[in-house]
Amino acid sequence: MMLDLVKYPVIRTEKTTRLVENNQLSFDVDVRITKPQIRKIIEEFFNVKVLAVNTHRPPRKTNRLGSKPSYKRVIVTVDSDVTLLK
């Protein structure tokens, strides 16, 4: 199932709490998933219209040779008349 590639929502930082006010949600997803797949998963699971999908891979921790983060951080912008967190 495609939803298994979404690891968890990110709501633990100050920036992500500010993003929620702008109708943006942050998720950590598998590195193999693409932007169109992310858009499809979010639209089907939450029944919202996704306006934009931005992705980036966070920098790896120092002193860990040979390892990369096994996740990609995604910021999804949804339509303004929808609230996901009630």
From Swiss-Prot:
Binds to 23S rRNA. It comes from Chlorella vulgaris (Green alga). One of its GO terms (molecular function) is rRNA binding. Its main location: plastid. This is Large ribosomal subunit protein uL23c. The gene is rpl23. Keywords: Chloroplast, Plastid, Ribonucleoprotein, Ribosomal protein, RNA-binding, rRNA-binding. It is found in: Plastid, Chloroplast. It comes from the Eukaryota. GO terms for biological process: translation. The keyword rRNA-binding applies. Part of the 50S ribosomal subunit. GO terms for cellular component: chloroplast; ribonucleoprotein complex; ribosome. Pfam families: Ribosomal_L23 (PF00276). Belongs to the universal ribosomal protein uL23 family. Gene3D superfamilies: 3.30.70.330.
